């Protein structure tokens, strides 16, 4: 398969090296939640994430991760005025599959702001910043799958393993206030699933159930014969935290018995370092080839929603809106070196 240099990371392929990069918890890109970086074979890092207004998809690129901070952002697609893809443009990811560029993102409708579904863009060309992106429509379930993408669905990511390509996404069942679970399926094409959805994880523990029952924002890293899928849990404020699933590299990824889930968060708020609600991460490698995690977090505890970001169809009282961290724009993209314990498991530690 033609995934030239995926955002998934094979950590064992990268020898440790001394880093020239200054280690810091400071943001690399301001006000970009759900950050995603793809390092392509052209030597560029391609960055995207949720813009604060949730109304467009931006991409920037640079030769270094740090260079992304000052790289010019290009708006490559904007929301529709009404109907599908007209509200809540969330968590875009850029991937290179079978010689073509794709963007996966979630979107809802102006008149139904929680009707989120995963959508796909395809590039007609090879320059993601300048060539035309066209809409392929909503991600499609397998022919024998009546459930996938029929309810609140978001945070889709793509990865390859043992010659197969997979799509992992979050979906609620039973309406807006039901649990958000993570699902996994093999892909038939960049826009369609091949297999029926498999529920990878549901919010089992108290730390996954703060304000909302949430598992979302999956990302993949591999090391020493294991595949790991990190995810984020709870509401988008200071309670937001990361968990992790692991499986043997030769296991059937669509078998529940293949996976072990972390009982506790692998990354959470650190008040001493003023890092609140870390999560919705992605993985890449730095210029030395060492694994790096990109994540978002705020630098204060109490998020304050900006009424200007709220859809006109959201009729909640102003005080309730101001208390909603979803509409606080200051989730900043940050980076972290990925370390490994004696058993080869990823360890995530602030500097």
Each predicted region: which residue ranges?
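Carbohydrate-active catalytic/glycan-binding domains of CAZyme proteins
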Residues: 3-351
